[in-house]
Curated annotation (Swiss-Prot):
UniProt keyword annotations, A-Z: Cytoplasm, Endonuclease, Hydrolase, Metal-binding, Nuclease, Ribosome biogenesis, rRNA processing, Zinc
Name assigned to this protein: Endoribonuclease YbeY
Organism domain of life: Bacteria
Principal location listed in the UniProt entry: cytoplasm
Pfam family name, one: YbeY
Species, as recorded: Aliivibrio fischeri (strain MJ11)
Compartment(s) where it occurs, according to its Swiss-Prot or TrEMBL record: Cytoplasm
GO molecular function per UniProt: metalloendopeptidase activity; RNA endonuclease activity; zinc ion binding
Length: 153
């Protein structure tokens, strides 16, 4: 069981970001439950890059907390490459304040949430959202964090 992480820090201020060790802890709590090996990129960006990508790929004219770009292997090619997570530092920090959550817990939630997207989970339909949120809650609580959706319940 191994996870290869390509960590890219593409924001001006690196102070207060989760460590690579934190990111690996969170990834190891999720991915091995679905597949034994994986390779992925986590790119931590500023609002400008998040806004541009969110506009280009989702048609949304604003930055967002996390974007997931699953790798789609050509037919007949099997790779452990999961894809890329793009996480916007400022949005995560603002949401943590708005939702009255510890910042580290919200970072963990964004990594868990994005990883589940890379593994094929989605939340477009209500039943999918319920399944994904339930799994996120279970994984977060398994790492000692509170239910990330407690404020919505």
């Amino acid at each position: 069981m191994s996870i290869e992480l390509d960590l890219q820090i593409a924001c001006e201020n690196e102070n207060g970001l989760p460590s690579e060790k934190d990111l690996m802890t969170w990834l190891n709590a999720v991915i091995p439950q679905f597949q034994p090996q994986a390779e992925l990129t986590i790119r931590i960006v500023d609002e400008k890059e998040s806004h541009e990508l969110n506009h280009e790929y989702r048609g949304k004219d604003k930055p967002t907390n996390v974007l997931s770009f699953p790798f789609e292997a050509p037919p007949g090619l099997e790779l452990d490459l999961l894809g890329d997570l793009i996480i916007c530092r400022q949005v995560v920090e603002e949401e943590a304040i708005e939702q009255n959550k510890p910042l580290l817990a919200h970072w963990a939630h964004m990594v868990v949430h994005g990883s589940l997207h890379l593994l094929g989970y989605d939340h477009i339909e209500d039943d999918e959202a319920e399944e994904m949120e339930s799994l996120e809650t279970e994984l977060m609580q398994g790492m000692g964090f509170e239910d990330p959706y407690i404020a919505e319940k």
